[in-house]
Amino acid sequence: MNCTEEFIAKMKQKDIVINFVQAWRNDTLEESYARLDKPTRLHAYSVSKSVTSIGVGLAVQEGLLRLDDPVLRFYPEYDPAELAPNLRRMTVRDLLKMGCGSKDKMFFWNDAQRLQCRDWQDYFLRNAFPYEPGTRFEYNNFNSYMCSCIVERAAGCTLKDYMTPRFFDKLGIGNPDWLTCPMGHSAGANGLFLSIDEMS
């Protein structure tokens, strides 16, 4: 029994369903397991956050934004005087570091208002932000969602469309599936669907 088979057997004992496993060493696929057809795309959940961060890096490389840009630079339609003081100090870097200064890690995503709110950016920008940005690590989806929206505002197209020729096409990932918010912006924090081969 190889390591992958041993791992799958242990997961089955715990009633944990594993769809795919690939073990690579020195660019060689050593072991694999597939419960489904390999081309099947599955929700990559928070792997999406890493891809969004790459999108921010590409935008920085192309001079569309800087990590120390204030978030509000990309929202000129908002009057800073009407927003939380900590939001006025928040930067793109703070979002990437999961340090927006929100009240808790499940900010918005477990909130009943999410079910009725269409404009997630507006919801974020009108939050109280009790903590100074960059001083607390609070893992939440909104940091990455806002990074996605900032790249969109800087590039003039959705994060998915921005990354397709610069990232997905170069990796052979054709027509990637990425869920959007009610306003049509790439979710950023999650919602990216990839096959095991596309992820590896």
What role is predicted for each listed range?
Residues 47-53, 89, 139-144, 192, ...:
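Short alpha-helical patches at coil-to-helix transitions and adjacent helical residues
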Residues 3-37:
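A short, well-structured edge-of-sheet supersecondary motif
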Residues 43-68, 95, 147-151, 199:
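Active-site SXXK
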Residues 62-100, 126, 154-194:
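Active-site helix/loop module of the DD-peptidase/beta-lactamase fold
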Residues 38, 107-190:
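Catalytic-site signature segments of enzymes, centered on catalytic residues
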Residues 14-15, 86-89, 116:
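Extracellular/periplasmic catalytic domains that process cell-envelope and extracellular macromolecules
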Residues 17, 23-25, 30, 89, ...:
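N-terminal core-entry segment
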Residues 83-85, 106-109:
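Short, conserved acidic/polar surface loops in the N-terminal third of protein domains
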